[in-house]
Structures are given as structure tokens and as C-alpha cells.
Amino acid sequence: MNQELERLEERCLSSELIFDGKVVHLYVDRVSLPDGQSSIREYVKHIGAVAVLPLTDEGEVICVRQYRYAHRCLLTEIPAGKLDRSDEDHVEAALRELREETGATCRTLTHLGLYRSTPAILDEKVDLYFAEGLTFGETDPDDDEFLEVHRIPLSTMVEMVMRGEITDGKTQVAVLKVNEILRRRAQDSENAKG
């Protein structure tokens, strides 16, 4: 076992399901700490999710604006959604969310990595993707999903992130990663020219 993990790992002594909801499941666990003491950990289990940053050939991000009840405000976000099943293919889920929320399909889908939204209390993992070569059709949001689709230049989105106007974490991470990918592509293209 990794020595660092051995020094820092907390081991579960007991686990109790407190709330078993449709989307989340709340647990209270008693854990053994690395120094031998015990403590309580409250956490939420979540099936996982995907998020997609769709970029047009003109450099615009297709994003959605929707009311988030838990925060009681409107947020600008990239298309995203929870997995329908724990064994659902994440690429298929990303393509589904892209189509449902924006009406788009893509020629290229690049995995940007894994994002853990709130690791102290939530085990949700969000796989982030970058969609290019977009073709547009009709949106098909879920019955309880009300959102507006917007096109915002990537450079503007970067500035919105830096000014604190975009507060959704997955969107911040995806915007900054895609911006860096495009910067490196441009640099590689310049270097190839000589």
C-alpha cells in the first residue's frame, strides 16, 4: 500500500444510512483516524455526473442558464447531468446531456479529466468533456428542467470566471482547461510553422 495513504487514511468502523433519496444518500460513519482515535464523518453518496463544454467553430461556448434551487439563484453553467445508472457509459451520458440541453451533437469529444465537487462531504465525481465540431438540432430537456441556452465567447467566459461572475465549479474548471488546450494548440501550430 502507498505509504502516504497508510499515514493519512481513515478506516470505516461503522456506517449508517440516514436518508435514502432519489438522487442522494446521506451516511453517518464512525471512522478510525490515523492516530488511532475515532471520529464521525457525515457524507453524501451520489451516482456521479458528466459535464460538457461545447465550443462552436467561432469560439463560442454553448452554455445554459438555469435556476438552482439549493442556492436560490440563476447560474451560468456548461451542460451537465447525473448518470442515469451507475454502470452508464460516461461518454454516452455526456453526449446525451449535450443533446438534451443544447440540441447539439459533436464530431469530437475529448475527456478533460475528473472533477470532485465537494470532497469533504460528497463523493460525487464529475467527468468533464470538451465537445467540438458541433451540429445543432432541437433541445430535449428533462420534464422538470427549465433552462435558457446561451452562446458566450470563450474569452468572455474566461474573464467571467476570473471576475467571479461564473461561480459553478465544474464550469470554471472546464473553461480554464479548454482555454489552456486552445492556447497550447495555437502555440504548437506556431512552432510547427518554424
PLM ranges: what are they?
Residues 2, 6-7, 41, 51-96:
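Conserved Nudix-box catalytic region and its N-terminal flanking loop in Nudix hydrolases
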Residues 2-13, 37, 126, 144-194:
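Nudix hydrolase/Nudix homology domain
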Residues 12, 26-28, 40, 64, ...:
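Hydrophobic residues on conserved beta-strands that form the core of alpha/beta folds
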Residues 14-51, 57:
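Acidic, metal-coordinating catalytic segment for phosphate/diphosphate chemistry
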Residues 15, 64-66, 114:
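Residue-level detector of high-confidence beta-strand sites
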Residues 25-29, 74, 125-127, 148:
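Short beta-strand micro-motifs in enzyme catalytic cores
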Residues 39, 48-51, 56, 82-169:
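Unchanged
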